[in-house]
């Protein structure tokens, strides 16, 4: 039976993790023991483990406390720190599910490069966090393991006061907001690190596309997927970024060392952090922004002005077409990437005997993927089919146009640019762009479902503020302002500029 | 941007009419407030898939069947599921139509599809072409470059370990009679 639904209520709500987070941060003096032990218990029970937002790591969770583990971890710049990885980042010691039924029994034969780098730097992995299945969603409600609620709000689902954590890295953001670990890894395809960080009141950093290795990251849309870092401490985010900012020959999209070195010298020359030009893209001034979001945006721009920086209005017209481009590329790439899951060599396979090999694959895929993933695969295959037109190519052209428009706005020449005309006159251009992360704070579960029952595109268009930086691969951070987030965007490769400005802004919060 | 054609790989830069611009400086707090209170568009424009637009997209039962097959999903769906699917594909097409705004021609079929913009360094700054000698030397070096982490050595990936909850083999029953 095909399960295609335009709007899907979560199959089951699993507030237990969030209740635990909420209780831990509110009243328990040592929340770690109870949380870790509960994870160990659920990990032993593989059926109920599937209901948890965090699955335990057998390597790091079998001692009495996390701090004992962290203290005995190898020396390095992250020695003594703990972290949680989004469950689309593969590890050898536990299942790597992508929050999908089809991978619910999958154990990777290798560790992701990011996990190995953090291990070498002395950080301890505590567990894996929930996500929208394969990263497809903005709410962490599209998961085989249930919904992750937002620990900043009440988690009483019955009262209608529970709020979504955002997504798709909602489990990572909720875990950080609940003080479970020093930081968490997420992945950001169209805003999946920044938006949940904003909803959960934490910092979420999406570095430049290609900076951090994607080896061992379960692909959703490979031209956009970027590993990101979530923490409530900007200095921790920066330290983790420096550990992960390495070329990896296993990842063909990794930025080569010569480009990294060239960026290092350019960024240190070009940016005078005491007198920056800050751009406000007028296409981000949409009528849908809440009054609170506008107030927060105003307050941050005012702070930057008071710090001596120049604030300018800029125009990047292709931002208006960015969502159409993004959802064409992302669904097409998803249809291709997810075609590998057939449940034959690995992954969930049906117990029912099938007459043909083809029937087995159809049964596994139909039962293995959730409704939103099925819809995106179907949309992707339709978009790529001859019936609909050559939209994928058109979407890459809009993407290229957007990159060129950003190049006209930024001071720093794009490291890939070989068009000298673009860079003749750079005076008066911007060092950073500033915009809100989301058009409003986290909605309640009820509001979220009501909105999407009208039209599933409602969920897609809310990504308007985060998708342009994803399409252009720009380093972008979301820093918290209460229950909202503000994005600082830099030119491709100017990650350090983005971090430096964020540190200053967080000092004067 | 990398272009693949009959003459091999070439790098080219597409010329766009660039419309981005740096506007005025927001000198005072009042200027900032005014700028943020003057919206230039609304997201509703993107989802205002009015009936006329939706109806202009034709998605037949045959197309639905084809897309389901392409996706390796069960084609045995109810009429209600089919209706939902037609509606989803139509909404996606109305959404995608915004890609063609500001275009002189609205034809969605392109004559050339050998260009593909990606944010990959070698697409924009390809290195020197390899000589035959270098290529052969690379092939010679391959045996030393195999990586167990990529499953490139015998036994480095064990299927049974990857599926600890599953029986290691799927069984397909042959049709009786």
Swiss-Prot record, chain B:
Compartment list: Mitochondrion inner membrane
CDD domains reported in the protein's UniProt record: GatF (cd21422)
Membrane topology: Peripheral membrane protein
EC numbers, comma separated: 6.3.5.-
Catalytic activity: L-glutamyl-tRNA(Gln) + L-glutamine + ATP + H2O = L-glutaminyl-tRNA(Gln) + L-glutamate + ADP + phosphate + H(+)
Superkingdom per UniProt: Eukaryota
Region: Disordered, residue numbers: 148-177
Polar residues bias (residue ranges): 153-164
Keyword field contains Zinc: no
A Pfam family matched in the record: GatF
Keywords annotated in UniProt: ATP-binding, Ligase, Membrane, Mitochondrion, Mitochondrion inner membrane, Nucleotide-binding, Protein biosynthesis, Transit peptide
Annotated GO MF terms: ATP binding; glutaminyl-tRNA synthase (glutamine-hydrolyzing) activity
Coiled coil (residue ranges): none
Transit peptide as recorded in UniProt: 1-16
GO biological process, one term: mitochondrial translation
Family under the similarity heading: Belongs to the GatF family.
Protein name in the entry: Glutamyl-tRNA(Gln) amidotransferase subunit F, mitochondrial
